[in-house]
């Protein structure tokens, strides 16, 4: 998992809007099926987007991805991505 703040910022910025959306939902504890239903896409599409998240963030699973998201001040309760990521 990346530890340098600037490296993490670059990795978070590399996520597509859909990858960010899927990661936010997954970090709130939603299952792939629930995310798919909410976004009106297939479960396969959700898995595809999560695989992209894992690759871009250099993590192995949704728990590690969520930990990175929370460590940067985003995630459950925040509702928004940090401005450094959204820009």
Predicted features, each with a name:
Residues 18-19, 47:
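The N-cap/first-turn positions of alpha helices
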Residues 1-18, 24, 78-87:
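Regulatory hinge/linker segments at domain boundaries
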Residues 26-30, 69:
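Short helix-to-turn junction characteristic of helix-turn-helix DNA-binding domains
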Residues 24, 37, 67:
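A cross-family signal for key residues in well-ordered alpha-helices
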Residues 20-21, 64:
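Pre-recognition alpha-helix immediately N-terminal to the DNA-recognition helix
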Residues 31-64:
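Recognition helix of helix-turn-helix DNA-binding domains
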Residues 9, 55-87:
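Basic, Lys/Arg-enriched C-terminal extension of HTH/homeodomain DNA-binding domains
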């Amino acid at each position: 998992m990346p530890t340098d703040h600037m490296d993490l910022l670059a990795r978070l910025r590399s996520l597509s809007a859909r990858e960010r959306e899927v990661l936010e939902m997954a970090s709130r504890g939603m299952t792939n099926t629930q995310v798919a239903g909410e976004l009106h896409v297939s479960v396969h599409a959700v898995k595809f987007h999560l695989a992209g998240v894992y690759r871009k963030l250099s993590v192995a699973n949704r728990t590690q991805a969520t930990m990175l998201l929370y460590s940067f001040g985003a995630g459950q309760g925040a509702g928004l991505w940090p401005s450094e990521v959204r820009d």
